[in-house]
Design a protein with these regions (language model features):
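Exposed loop/turn and edge beta-strand positions of beta-sandwich/beta-sheet ligand-binding modules
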Residues: 1, 35, 73
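Residue-level preference for long, well-ordered alpha-helices that form the structural scaffold
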Residues: 3, 7-10, 79
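Short, contiguous alpha-helical
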Residues: 8-12, 16-22, 27-69, 108-158
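Acidic/histidine-rich alpha-helical segments that form the ligand environment
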Residues: 74-108, 115-138
Length: 158
């Protein structure tokens, strides 16, 4: 299995987990923060929804495109639609480049000016997984049920 094939397989496995995390966010708790300096739950969920639109351009042009204003005022339905659309586009964009381009194509953004497409794409995926974990801790603190992500949740069948 190539690195690119593995990335696509992991992306396919993780997509429903991101969806579960967004679905678990109560509609009336988007503004919830665990601490004043923390991001809101809605902002974290919105990032999970649109992160894929940032990774797609890495595969194609070597540079992510991220608009933080996209994270504002999204409903849960908007987030779920963006997630589905972004995941579909990302898969198509990664599939469209050769394994060689994935492995050796140059990518750059911010301090990571001399990176590769595969490394930067994986970093953005891991960043999304990290933020999903943050959101999940918010969900329980809000009094909502935590979905199973990698295994059973203490909230299953309750």
């Amino acid at each position: 299995m190539t690195n690119k094939t593995f990335f696509l397989a992991v992306l396919k496995e993780e997509a429903p987990r991101f969806k579960k995390a967004i679905e678990a966010l109560p509609d009336d708790k988007h503004g919830y923060k665990v601490q004043e300096r923390s991001r809101t739950a809605g902002n974290l969920a919105a990032q999970l929804a649109v992160q894929w639109k940032a990774i797609s351009p890495i595969a194609i042009s070597g540079s992510p495109k991220f608009d933080p204003h996209e994270l504002d005022n999204l409903t849960k339905a908007d987030m779920l639609a963006e997630l589905d659309k972004g995941m579909t586009q990302l898969q198509a964009d990664v599939e469209s480049i050769s394994d060689e381009e994935w492995e050796t194509g140059q990518a750059g953004w911010g301090e990571a000016k001399n990176d590769t497409k595969y490394h930067m794409s994986w970093a953005f995926l891991f960043d999304a997984i990290h933020h999903r974990g943050q959101l999940i801790t918010f969900i329980r603190a809000m009094g909502a049920k935590v979905p199973s992500i990698y295994g059973p949740s203490a909230d299953d069948d309750k």
